[in-house]
Each structure stands twice: as structure tokens, then as C-alpha cells.
Curated annotation (Swiss-Prot):
Gene3D superfamilies: 1.10.530.10. Residues 1-20 form the signal peptide. Belongs to the glycosyl hydrolase 22 family. It comes from Lucilia sericata (Green bottle fly). GO terms for biological process: defense response to bacterium; killing of cells of another organism. It catalyses: Hydrolysis of (1->4)-beta-linkages between N-acetylmuramic acid and N-acetyl-D-glucosamine residues in a peptidoglycan and between N-acetyl-D-glucosamine residues in chitodextrins. Lysozymes have primarily a bacteriolytic function. Shows antibacterial activity against Gram-positive bacterium M.luteus but shows no activity against Gram-negative bacterium E.coli. Likely to play a role in the eradication of ingested pathogens during their passage through the intestine. One of its GO terms (molecular function) is lysozyme activity. This is Lysozyme 1B. Its EC number is 3.2.1.17. SUPFAM superfamilies: Lysozyme-like.
Length: 142
């Protein structure tokens, strides 16, 4: 019986990953531009998404040292920016449920990421160090 339970859970996890969206650098740049993100910021956002989630929408990061988790294509933290489904306390600065940041429709993720940037700048993402001064071109995306 334990094997059957494990098999069902594994199958559900696989199905969830199989149906989740994975962007490319260009498809993400175009989607964000369509949502009103300035073209001058798109190279930065695509670089952050590359290192945070490999352009995948469904990623929930492992527990951080404080027990918080990061969600979605931009790995938004649940201690400060989104409300986790487990009921744990959060500042919820973006006024969004963390699970909404895992959707294929990235509008909530983009809104929240822009809000985080407006409060903390690009350095809110530790991966920014990999991008700063080494941005990918998005010219061929448009």
C-alpha cells in the first residue's frame, strides 16, 4: 500500500512539472513586454529568471535558512512578499498568494517582482551579481 501511495504522489508531481510552463529568454522578454515592462529592463529580468528558476514558472525553492521559501519564475520570498498556503505569517508586501506566483500566467509574478524591485532594487535577487555587467541581449527577441 505504501508503494501505491508513493507511486500516486510521484505521478502527480511529475504531471505538475510536465504541465508547468518553461519560458525561453525571448518568450519571457516578449511576455513581459506585453505586460508593460519597459524594454530597457527586459535583459535584467530575463537574466534574473534564468538564474533563479531556469525560466520555469512552477519552481518552489528549498527552505531558506529562516524557513521561508521562494516561489515562481522570479523566486519571490514568502516571508516578505507573498502569502504562503501553509498559513505561516508573512508581510505579504505584494498582496498575493504564493501559489499564484506558480501559474503559467506570469502577470502576478511580474507585478510582484516589479514591486520588490521598487522597494529593494535589483540586488533583492542574490543572482543579480551574476547578471550585473553581463546581461544577455534581447535584441533578437523582437
Amino acid at each position: 500500500m505504501k508503494f501505491i501511495n508513493f507511486f500516486v504522489i510521484a505521478l502527480m508531481a511529475y504531471a505538475n512539472c510536465a504541465w508547468a510552463k518553461t519560458f525561453t529568454r525571448c518568450s519571457l522578454a516578449r511576455a513581459m513586454y506585453a505586460l508593460g515592462v519597459p524594454k530597457s529592463e527586459l535583459a535584467r529580468w530575463t537574466c534574473i529568471a534564468k538564474y533563479e528558476s531556469h525560466y520555469r514558472t512552477h519552481v518552489v525553492g528549498p527552505a531558506n535558512t529562516d524557513g521561508s521559501h521562494d516561489y515562481g519564475i522570479f523566486q519571490i520570498n514568502d516571508r516578505y512578499w507573498c502569502k504562503p498556503s501553509n498559513g505561516r505569517s508573512s508581510h505579504n508586501g505584494c498582496n498575493v498568494y504564493c501559489d499564484d506566483l506558480l501559474e503559467d500566467d506570469i502577470s502576478e509574478s511580474v507585478y510582484c517582482a516589479q514591486h520588490v524591485k521598487s522597494k529593494q532594487g535589483w540586488s533583492a535577487w542574490t543572482t543579480w551579481a551574476k547578471c550585473n555587467g553581463n546581461l544577455p541581449s534581447i535584441d533578437e527577441c523582437f
